[in-house]
A protein has these predicted regions:
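Conserved active-site-proximal phosphate/metal-binding subdomains
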Residues: 14, 22-44, 48-66, 72-216
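Glycine/serine-rich phosphate-binding loop and adjoining beta1-alpha1 elements at the start
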Residues: 18
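Active-site glycine- and acidic-residue-rich loops that bind
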Residues: 1-7, 71
Length: 216
């Protein structure tokens, strides 16, 4: 529907389709209901081939399909390619690189995370999201709202914080997390956050995934 609407109104088709599985991804999970988060119908194995087929048969374009959610190893990448994806999106894998611009406290929160620290919340947009259980999120899960700051961005079409002052300002909470405010931040993460044990250089991760790269 989105692709056809853009084609009709703007004579443009997407440059690519990112297919994200809620089973493992971080942040907003691409589904609308909490019970859909663990539904295997939204696995990469199910959805990627369907989207690839749609692009080939309906759009008739070489538009790339990019798999996201839970991609960590070279084997994960190759599996995504076997499903028909043209590329992968890796977020959590690179979150604790030295080159990443998040604060050291943000990165340490990832490094310290355990499986019990990873929770599913309903965001101010009314959508499921995966995040670390920070003091901020603990209070939100207990009380349903932690809103005591102004709406700073008017960034969402649907936002309970802007309209009702319930839940919280997601823009402010993400900024707080980025700058390392553990007490008041929303630390979105994927399930693979528990596999992070240290900060790394991007080059070392690339070498692990694809082999050492020669300087050119």
């Amino acid at each position: 529907l989105i692709a056809r609407r853009w084609e009709r109104l703007y004579n443009r088709l997407p440059d690519g389709f990112v297919v994200e599985t809620p089973l493992y991804a971080g942040g907003h999970l691409g589904v609308t209901k909490m019970e859909q988060v663990e539904n295997e119908e939204f696995s990469l194995e199910k959805v990627v081939p369907e989207v690839v087929e749609y692009v080939e048969k309906e759009l008739k374009t070489p538009t790339p399909v990019i798999a996201a959610g839970g991609i960590w190893t070279r084997e994960d990448i190759e599996h995504a390619f076997d499903l028909g994806a043209s590329g992968v999106q890796m977020g959590t894998r690179f979150a604790c690189t030295y080159e990443g611009d998040a604060s050291d406290r943000f990165k340490q929160a990832y490094i310290d995370a355990t499986e019990e620290d990873v929770v599913i919340i309903q965001s101010p947009a009314g959508l499921p999201g995966r995040a670390l259980r920070s003091p901020f999120i603990d209070k939100y899960l207990r009380e349903g709202t932690v809103g005591n700051k102004p709406c700073i961005a008017n960034c969402l079409t649907h936002c309970r914080y802007r309209t009702e002052r319930k839940t919280f300002c997601i823009a402010q909470a993400l900024i707080d997390a980025f700058f390392g405010n553990w007490e008041e931040g929303l630390f979105f993460c994927g399930t693979n956050v528990t596999r992070i044990t240290k900060k790394e250089y991007v080059a070392d991760i690339i070498a692990e995934l694809f082999g050492p790269q020669e300087n050119k």
